[in-house]
Design a protein with these regions (language model features):
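N-terminal alpha/beta PP-like core and its mobile active-site loop of ThDP/TPP-dependent enzymes
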Residues: 1-248, 252, 372, 379-382, ...
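A short, charged, Gly/Pro-tolerant segment at domain boundaries
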Residues: 70-79, 257-268, 450-461
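Short, surface-exposed connector motifs at secondary-structure boundaries
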Residues: 40, 112-118, 297-298, 350-354, ...
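Thiamine diphosphate
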Residues: 180, 218-220, 226-228, 232-236, ...
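Conserved short loop/turn motifs at secondary-structure junctions
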Residues: 122-127, 277-278, 359-361
């Protein structure tokens, strides 16, 4: 379900029951039950089907919008030999498309006519390998860039034209441009409305949408110009068209725009400085995030949030720099997903320092996966905000307090040690940076680490 919500291509091969038991209750059928949460699902009913089924599966994984693909392996069929004449699998190619020249021309015309345009960078920029082209378009036009939660790290947030990223909450600079812009060029984004993303804040904006999913165009928003196709090819076409029209010089006042962004960012950080540098005990959540942001080697780290309050607090304030250095997720908001996600990140990037920030409630959902990380040798660091409560409940569920819903306790450092990891406990703000340094060193030696941070229930959110 998480892969479906976040449009992530994964292959799932569940075992199925015997053919003559498919219709017998309570046997489970992937074909019948997964329809609403996958991109494609089928079952193998005879050995001769395997090559064709796998070709269709990998075609779906490599082309069009992302999503999970399921091939159910029926039990008795999988015990049979595949006939020699059925060994016919051929790896399907990736087929790329790009918008028509007329659509590109219309988009460039609209961009040049806009007084306050905005580039909206979605996950498709990352998955399409288009981060360099996004930066080039921004610098060619002087248009600032906002990154969605799944698109966070598509643009280096230190870049003077980057406004930052947003989940349901965002930076002040992003909030300003999202409210005041008269045109949005959405790149690699479905623009689907969600509690975990920023809305299109008025109907008076020109909306240009690029996506490789035709069903996403005008799904939730009225789109003026549709750029259907691969995001990188779309960006290259836009860049070429702008260069042709301007003699290579581009348009837009980069210095003036960058100056405004810098001023708004400085004002925003000044407002938040008391919390980001707070010395209170238990530790303020934003001080924890600030220490992570200050002390990590961003280009050699991969970080992620967890569902709920950690996501809301982390996304605006962590500075993503290089592509895929931040993994933004959570449209179905599964508590605890951060730990297995970072194990996967470590498997794919063993040289990187992989860290997830989570609450104590989320740890209750997947904390035993620290044993997996420890046993497998894929050493990660988990920073756990130990505040004894599920931070969402006090605001949205006033009756929960009567029954203790969301309340919890535990020595999580000790629990981690019981599963083969190293447990560190932080009770003072001054100890946070040394703990992160120690965690990096322990990870390098192959040891998984949990940092149990005694933190507060900070309620303030970056809502602009």
């Amino acid at each position: 379900a998480q892969a479906y919500a976040d449009s992530i291509p994964i292959l799932v091969l569940p075992g199925g029951v015997l053919l003559n038991q498919i219709a017998v209750k309570p046997n489970f059928s992937a074909v019948h039950n997964y329809q609403g949460i996958v991109k494609q699902v089928e079952a193998v009913y005879q050995p001769e089907d395997i090559g064709n089924a796998m070709r269709r599966a990998f075609h779906a994984l490599r082309n069009g919008p992302g999503g999970p693909v399921v091939v159910e392996l029926t039990a008795d069929v999988c015990m049979k030999e595949i006939p020699d004449n059925a060994l016919n699998y051929q790896s399907p190619p990736r087929a790329l498309a790009q918008p028509s020249d007329s659509d590109i021309s219309d988009a460039v015309k609209a961009l040049r006519a806009a007084k306050r345009p905005l580039l909206w960078a979605g996950q498709g920029v990352l998955l399409g390998g288009a981060t360099a082209e996004l930066k080039q378009l921004a610098e060619l036009t002087g248009i600032p860039v906002f990154c969605t939660m799944p698109g966070k790290s598509a643009m280096d947030e230190r870049h003077p034209l980057c406004l930052g990223a947003g989940s349901g909450l965002t930076t002040m600079a992003a909030g300003k441009w999202l409210s005041e812009c008269d045109l949005i060029l959405a790149l690699g984004s479905s623009l689907t409305r969600t509690f975990y993303g920023q809305p299109i804040r008025s109907n008076n904006k020109v909306l240009i949408q690029n996506t490789d999913d035709i069903s996403a165009i005008s799904r939730d928003e009225s789109v003026d110009i549709a750029l259907l196709g691969d995001t990188r090819l779309t960006l290259l076409a836009l860049i070429d068209a702008i260069k042709d029209e301007t003699g290579g010089s581009g348009f837009g006042d980069i210095k003036s725009t960058a100056k405004i962004i810098a001023e708004v960012k400085a004002d925003w950080l000044k407002q938040w400085q008391p919390l980001l540098t707070s010395t209170e005990e238990p530790l303020n959540t934003y001080r924890v995030i600030h220490e992570i942001d200050k002390n990590l080697d961003h280009e050699n780290s991969i970080v992620t949030h967890d569902a709920g309050a950690p996501r809301d607090s982390f996304v605006p304030f962590y500075t993503a720099t290089s592509p895929h250095s931040y993994v933004g997720w959570g449209k179905t908001t599964h508590l605890g997903f951060g730990i297995p996600l970072m194990i996967g990140a470590k498997m794919a990037n063993p040289e990187k320092f992989c860290l997830n920030l989570m609450g104590d409630a989320a740890f209750g959902m997947s904390g035993t996966d620290l044993e997996t990380a420890s046993r497998s040798g894929f050493a990660i660091t988990t920073v756990l905000l130990n505040n004894g409560n599920m931070a969402t409940y006090p605001r949205g569920f006033p009756e929960a307090g009567k029954f203790g819903v969301g309340e919890m306790q535990g020595d999580y450092a000790k629990i981690a040690e019981g599963m083969g990891a190293v447990g560190l406990t932080v009770t003072k703000a001054s100890a946070m940076a040394p703990a992160l340094q120690q965690a990096r060193e322990l990870n390098q030696s192959g040891q998984t680490v949990l940092i149990d941070v005694h933190s507060n229930m900070e309620a303030k959110k970056s809502r602009y």
